A protein has these predicted regions:
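Soluble FAD-dependent oxygen oxidases
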Residues: 1-528
């Protein structure tokens, strides 16, 4: 009987995508490093493996990168413990092949699972252990766990603890924290990375390091600097935050015909300065008019969470934001986990078990961009934006208010620098459902034009952007002799003055630039 290891080796060697013996050499190395040849056969998927396509697709969250022409990995490695991660790093480095690190697969540009050179995907989705310690008010969370799984495990142990992460439950913890994730408690508690207590990372030499052994600089860098530039984060230890027994949510829609412009103008002054327990996200979308057949208008939708009861919220908004006209019938009181579900699916009948569903192999075609607003946009400016949005057709905007805790934390505390001085962040958003080059080109052109139109209203020198809303239009690192100069272009936008420190950390811990992607942190130029 042929051993499983040899069967897989034969499979890989016969792969049409195999480049020489690189993939076979990798498998031999992995078997040797783990000393578990039978186990290795269950971890590695060659292109000839019947399950290869389903494993690849499971965590592709942008359908733009799920096409026949999208570059495919030579192999997919799906480790189940940290020693297998070590082995994958060592073996990929030994044979000189690029390693892509994927947790939830939500990178907007597919950077975690595509490349223009031969590559291997290190799929972290099986590393999903979550250990919650309510006495310590902390949790160790593996990088392949999802936010939904994390929230569920916290809720299992306590109804008065939570974590200030994002509102999309299928997002992977590794990428979310690695890029400085945020959620609807950021005005009260700041970013996810403001609550990281420790971490375990595999470095470029295949060593496992924790906070003490990695040192202050690397620990700083992996909390929002794009952790995949520095190593493979296996797990983060996070601090939980207190949440009240009652949380209040609401969703209110207004159209231009209902004084939406006045409401948006006032929102800019209120949302970043009001009680830090209140987070009011605003969606701005071009839609068909309800009153004028065949015409387009703008609809705004305010989606909010208040860490308190309904009476407190209505009293607060009637005083600070009467233009909104919030009424008792607009609000819902829930516990914290109920608010998580409401934000995720807007369904009052869903149980928390839904958070454990990863919904694999589901993806829209999407394009995203980001900006920061530091001065309120005038009413004339808003009307200019509405006009352009209606002309373009489909691209929407999402306004996320800052202030509160975000203004109290120094810009240098973590690599994420966008703190005091920012009123709100803009996410540009366009989704579509059908494949095709012309559709992709059309919507890409739309979102780029809208981004250009907003230039006068957003931050300057640099025009800042958010790493976790990845956008290759703002710069790409081609990993050649100009790597540092190319990195400065997007690095200044994502990290502002923190970019230089990130480069120094990168040069110290990964001088050979093994961990790299289209927007990774470069090393310092080598002296002649």
């Amino acid at each position: 009987m042929i051993p499983l290891f040899l069967l897989l080796l034969l499979q890989i060697s016969a792969s049409p995508a195999a480049s020489g013996s690189v993939d076979a050499t990798f498998l031999q190395c992995l078997s040797k490093q783990t000393n578990q040849p039978a186990q290795v056969s269950k971890l590695v998927y060659a292109q000839s493996n019947p399950s290869y396509s389903s494993v690849l697709r499971a965590y592709i969250r942008n359908a733009r990168f799920n096409t026949s022409s999208t570059p495919k990995p030579v192999l997919i490695v799906t480790p189940t413990d940290e020693t297998q991660v070590q082995a994958a790093v060592i073996c990929a480095k030994n044979i000189g092949i690029q390693l892509k690190i994927r947790s939830g697969g939500h990178d907007y540009e597919g950077v975690s699972y595509i490349s223009d050179v031969p590559f291997i995907i290190l799929d972290m989705s099986n590393l999903r252990t979550i250990n919650v310690n309510i006495q310590e008010q902390s949790a160790w969370v593996s990088a392949g766990a999802t936010l939904g799984e994390l929230y569920y495990r916290i809720w299992e142990k306590s109804k008065v603890h939570g974590f200030p992460g994002g509102v999309c439950p299928t997002v992977g913890v590794g990428g979310h924290l690695g890029g400085g994730g945020y959620g609807n408690m950021l005005r009260k508690h700041g970013l996810t990375v403001d609550h990281v207590l420790d971490a375990k990372i595999v470095d470029a030499n295949g060593k496992i390091l924790d906070k003490n052994s990695m040192g202050e600089d690397l620990f700083w860098a992996i909390r929002g600097g794009g952790a995949a530039s520095f190593g493979v984060v296996i797990a983060y230890k996070i601090a939980l935050v207190p949440v009240p027994e009652k949380v209040t949510v609401f969703r209110v829609e207004k159209y231009l015909e209902e004084n939406a412009t006045d409401i948006v103008y006032k929102w800019q002054h209120v949302a970043p300065t009001i009680d830090e327990n209140l987070f009011m996200r605003m969606l701005v979308q071009p839609v068909s008019s309800k009153t004028k057949k065949g015409e387009k208008t703008i609809r705004i939708t305010i989606i909010a969470q208040f860490l308190g009861n309904a009476d407190e919220l209505i009293t607060l908004l009637n005083k600070e934001f009467p233009e909104l006209g919030l009424k008792n019938g607009d609000v819902l009181e829930k516990d914290w986990i109920g608010s998580v579900l409401w934000w995720g699916i807007k369904d009052n009948n869903t149980t928390p078990n839904w958070l454990l569903d990863r919904h694999p192999d589901t993806a829209d075609f999407t394009r995203r961009k980001s900006d920061y607003v530091q001065q309120p946009i005038s009413k004339d400016g808003l009307e200019f934006i509405w006009k352009r949005m209606i002309e373009l057709g489909k691209t929407g905007l999402v306004f996320n208010p800052y202030g509160g805790k975000m203004s109290q934390i120094p810009a240098s505390a973590t690599p994420f620098p966008h703190r005091a001085g920012n009123l709100f962040k803009i996410q540009y958003s366009v989704n579509w459902e059908e494949p095709g080059y012309e559709l992709d080109k059309n919507y890409t052109t739309q979102i780029r034009k809208l981004h250009d139109y907003l230039t006068p209203f957003v931050s300057k020198n640099p025009r800042s952007a958010y790493l976790n809303y990845r956008d290759l239009d703002i710069g790409v690192n081609h990993q050649g002799k100009n790597s540092y100069a190319e990195g400065q272009v997007f690095g200044a936008k994502y990290f502002n003055a923190n970019f230089d420190r990130l480069v120094k950390v990168k040069t110290a811990v990964d001088p050979d630039n093994f961990f790299r992607n289209q927007q990774s942190i470069p090393t310092l130029p080598k002296k002649a």
